[in-house]
Swiss-Prot record:
Residues 3-154 form the Tyrosine-protein phosphatase domain. It catalyses: O-phospho-L-tyrosyl-[protein] + H2O = L-tyrosyl-[protein] + phosphate. Pfam families: DSPc. This is Tyrosine-protein phosphatase 2. GO terms for biological process: negative regulation of MAPK cascade. The active site is at residue 96.
Length: 160
């Protein structure tokens, strides 16, 4: 059985447990059209099992190690990809191995940018849907994405 958590209407966060058939059933049952894999291994077995068209399965080779900058460097492009796919009416599954750090970090970033919300609010929103434990180096990256500006005499977050 494959499990992922629905973060909002279009975004799901999950792990990868090696059961490609269960993952396929999950994406079919939830009408998911795009998958983002944030893992440090070959995704050919996943890609083959899911049978998604080219461009519907994105892989960022990403380690959980603090020295890995692949995910922070890719987050703006992944966000743009997610927004484009969602704009096409598609649902997106973001997964890493446990579904707790890398994929959760991207989900938090997605909420921060799409809703212009501070890190802690976005983290709370994701945590309300799924148990997460984002690695410190991803937390530091996410926390630095938020600045504030005045709009109509109100202090508003601005996410970059």
């Amino acid at each position: 059985m494959y499990e992922a958590s629905q973060i909002d209407e279009h975004v799901f966060v999950g792990g990868y447990y090696g059961d490609n058939e269960a993952m396929l059933r999950f994406i079919e049952n939830h009408a998911i059209a795009s998958v983002i894999s944030l893992i440090d291994s070959d995704v050919a077995p996943i890609r083959h099992a899911l049978g998604l068209p080219v461009g519907d399965h994105i892989h960022v080779y990403c380690e959980a190690a603090p020295t890995c900058a692949a995910l922070p460097n890719a987050m703006p492009a992944l966000y743009d990809y997610m927004v484009r796919r969602i704009g096409e009416g598609k649902r997106v599954l973001v997964h890493c191995y446990a579904g707790a750090s890398r994929s959760a970090a991207l989900a938090v970033y997605y909420l921060m940018r799409s809703r212009q919300m501070p890190y802690q609010d976005a983290l709370n929103a994701v945590q309300s849907k799924r148990r997460v434990a984002i690695n410190d180096h991803f937390v530091r990256f996410l926390a630095t994405r938020c600045s504030y500006r005045f709009v109509n005499d109100e202090l508003k977050p601005q996410i970059v």
